[in-house]
Regions:
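DNA target-recognition domains and sequence-specific DNA-contacting regions of bacterial/archaeal
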Residues: 32-149
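Non-catalytic DNA-recognition/assembly elements of restriction-modification systems
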Residues: 1-42, 46-62, 156-187
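A generic structural motif
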Residues: 111-114, 154-158
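Short leucine-rich amphipathic alpha-helical surface patches
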Residues: 127-131, 149-156, 172, 176
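Short linear sequence motif anchored by a di-proline
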Residues: 9-10, 82, 96, 108, ...
Length: 187
């Protein structure tokens, strides 16, 4: 791959990707203060017709996809974080594509920043850090999800530093591409 460095330069130029400085301060925020939380919708196996729309269930694998269905319902969403509150609790996945959510999965959209892959993936990790608290006997239900605190970097106004989160995500992506390109070039 002779043009790998050109591709990395293009990635840097497109998103202004640079290594973000370490945030000065981190702070706890309630999930409910950061996100709008919306429910999925119950859809039984008997009501599912085979199709090409991903159906997101409470699993810890396959990016949450448990089936492929034909018809969307009111839970159809995209560019969203799907968080399990039943089944594999606290597991969560970013869904940049259109999909339908079961009633065991909540949909999270940022309240005060435009949803984007990099910020949502940053928040995914922050939410996953809380997984150890929850078990079958102590479920991650809707109320607990709303009041769960997550640790996020802050800006000068003591608000979540979404710019830092986005830049960090982009920078990590470029680092991984560089790692892959280096591996390919060694072969």
């Amino acid at each position: 791959m002779k043009n790998t460095s050109c591709l990395l330069v293009e990635l840097h130029n497109r998103g202004g990707v640079k290594q973000p400085a370490n945030p000065v301060k981190w702070k706890e925020f309630y999930v409910d203060d950061i996100f709008t939380i919306s429910p999925g919708k119950r859809l039984t196996k008997a009501d599912m017709d085979s199709g090409n729309i991903p159906f997101i269930g409470a699993t810890d694998s396959n990016n949450g996809i448990t089936n492929w269905i034909a018809t969307p319902n009111s839970s159809f969403d995209r560019n969203v974080l799907g968080v399990n509150y039943n089944g594999s609790v606290v597991e969560n996945f970013y869904h940049g594509y259109g999909c339908v959510f079961s009633d065991d999965v909540k949909r999270l959209h940022l309240k005060s920043y435009a949803d984007n892959k990099f910020v949502l993936l940053f928040c995914k990790v922050a939410i996953l850090q809380q997984k150890v608290k929850y078990t079958y006997g102590y479920k991650f239900n809707g109320q607990r999800m709303e009041r769960q605190k997550i640790l996020l970097p802050t800006d000068e106004q003591d608000s979540p530093d979404y710019t830092y989160m986005e830049q960090y995500g982009k920078w990590m992506m470029v680092q991984m591409y560089q790692y892959y390109f280096d591996y390919i070039n060694l072969r």
